[in-house]
Amino acid sequence: MTLGDDSSCPVKLIFLGTRGEIATRTRRHRMHSSLLVSYRDASVMIDCGLDWLGKFERLHPNAIVLTHAHPDHAWGLKNGAPCPVHASQKTWRELEGCEVEDRHLIKERVPKKICGITFEAFAVEHSILAPAVGYRVSAGHACIFYVPDLIFIHDRAAALKDAQIYIGDGATLSRSFVRKRGKRLIGHAPVRAQLPWCRKEGVPQAIITHAVRKLSPQMSANLPQSSARMELILR
């Protein structure tokens, strides 16, 4: 799909994978969740799970950006990468054994331009052992927020401000996958909880990725109704 008002230089989004960390594969959800963002003559791959080990090189990304260190998001880099890899300090700490040589740090709430595309990391609640971030991604007149794993966004209003698309967590549609470990929460917010965030912050389109199974029209019928100002897409 393409974004932006400039038809001569649009931002292109390619969903390379939409599957979560589960054994079940379907035709639509075959590879671990990953998004390729292309702008001008460069492409940045967001996340590179174990499914992509030995395969992602054929995509020739100019850079890779990681949301967190879980196997389905980062273990495709176990043997290294032929391009720069950007991640938070907490993620690099968990990936100490990965053979990535060209490592770069992304600081939370500090916009960073990578291959002409601006990435701003926002802390999200998801895991204690592998702390995660979501990314506000912008280039030209296009802006999206990508967060395949989360319970909630710590600074949601700033993260979603003027975003055209919210790409969120499809691990569960309506049942909560949130658990408590000590004083911390871990797990996944249901899609049912994420849609009101988009409505409140005025995001016109929500795309759900990181699916646990094939999403049917019957399942989506049980979700809160999208308003006239918001469109829901199940990937």
Identify what each model region corresponds to.
Residues 2-10, 87-141, 227-233:
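Metallo-beta-lactamase
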Residues 3-57, 131-148, 165:
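Conserved beta-strand hairpin/beta-sheet module of binuclear metal-dependent hydrolase folds
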Residues 16-20, 48-51, 69, 90, ...:
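Active-site metal-binding loops of divalent metal-dependent hydrolases
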Residues 23, 54, 74-75, 95, ...:
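Glycine/Thr-rich phosphate-binding loops of Rossmann-like dinucleotide-binding domains
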Residues 42, 81-84, 200-206:
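A short helix->loop->beta-strand "cap" motif at the edges of active sites that frequently abuts
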Residues 44, 49-87, 162-166:
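Active-site metal-binding motif and surrounding structural segment of the metallo-beta-lactamase
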Residues 57-59, 76-79, 97-99, 158-160, ...:
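Short amphipathic alpha-helical segments
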Residues 153-235:
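Cap/insert and terminal regions of metallo-dependent hydrolase folds
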